[in-house]
Amino acid sequence: MARGPKKHLKRLNAPKSWMLGKLGGVYAPRPSTGPHKLRECLPLLIFLRNRLKYALTNCEVTKITMQRLIKVDGKVRTDSNYPLGFMDVVTIEKTGEFFRLIYDVKGRFSIHRISNEEAKYKLCKVRRVQTGPKGVPFLVTHDGRTLRYPDPVIKVNDTIQLEIATNKILDSIKFDSGNLCMITGGRNLGRVGTVVSRERHPGSFDICHIKDSQGHTFATRMNNVFIIGKGSKAYVSLPRGKGVKLSIAEERDKRLAAKGAN
């Protein structure tokens, strides 16, 4: 019987969001254990090699990371298989580049460049609010952070704006109707819209109804909803398309219009 952790990941079993060709070998890089789940993360190796094209091989990525050039959320990461996840900020100081990991409407991690000012903070979804030993209140975020003595108004499913350098909470956004959100799981992954209403189903999954800027409405589980702004103002910049998913016919019309303009 097998003992211990799994050390390999077959390429065919790797998440589709990594966009690995199935003829490129037998194995895929297995992410290290870290703040994000295997199916919800992107290894640093794939980000540098396949997305940014800064390296051709695994060996070259290791040489880059071992020079301590790559920072994730303000901390140097030398592990080439480190799991990057939703809202993580990747800094490459040598080239002066800053990236935020964010989904596109097709459910893939897009290369989203951000400014130096925006790279100083990130948004975190509150997963748990509890009281620890000696009555110390604390909360746990979606990326595994534990923050002690938070503002008592912050509840589960709210979003906090976290300053990366100091780990201080700058602001909080309530999970309320009318606030802007992004979907982080399910078939609507990557879509952006405003929360319309929520249905409570005790003993099952609460359902959240969302409307995007084009007027399309859809529903998803509460667990998949990540609040990213108050009202219609987003706290982070969004990738091209602003999280609006077009139908097949709308995509075709847009493509034909672009071709006609050329």
Curated annotation (Swiss-Prot):
InterPro entries reported in the protein's UniProt record: KOW, Rib_uL2_dom2, Ribosomal_eS4, Ribosomal_eS4_C, Ribosomal_eS4_central_region, Ribosomal_eS4_central_sf, Ribosomal_eS4_KOW, Ribosomal_eS4_N
GO cellular component, one term: cytosolic small ribosomal subunit
GO MF annotation, one: rRNA binding
Ribonucleoprotein keyword on record: yes
GO biological process, one term: translation
Key words, A-Z: Ribonucleoprotein, Ribosomal protein, RNA-binding, rRNA-binding
Gene3D superfamilies, per database record: 2.30.30.30, 2.40.50.740, RNA-binding S4 domain
Key word ATP-binding present: no
Domain S4 RNA-binding: 42-104
HAMAP family the record matches: Ribosomal_eS4
PANTHER family, per the entry: 30S/40S RIBOSOMAL PROTEIN S4, SMALL RIBOSOMAL SUBUNIT PROTEIN ES4
Entry similarity comment: Belongs to the eukaryotic ribosomal protein eS4 family.
Name recorded for this polypeptide: Small ribosomal subunit protein eS4
Species per Swiss-Prot/TrEMBL record: Lysiphlebus testaceipes
Lineage: Eukaryota, Metazoa, Ecdysozoa, Arthropoda, Hexapoda
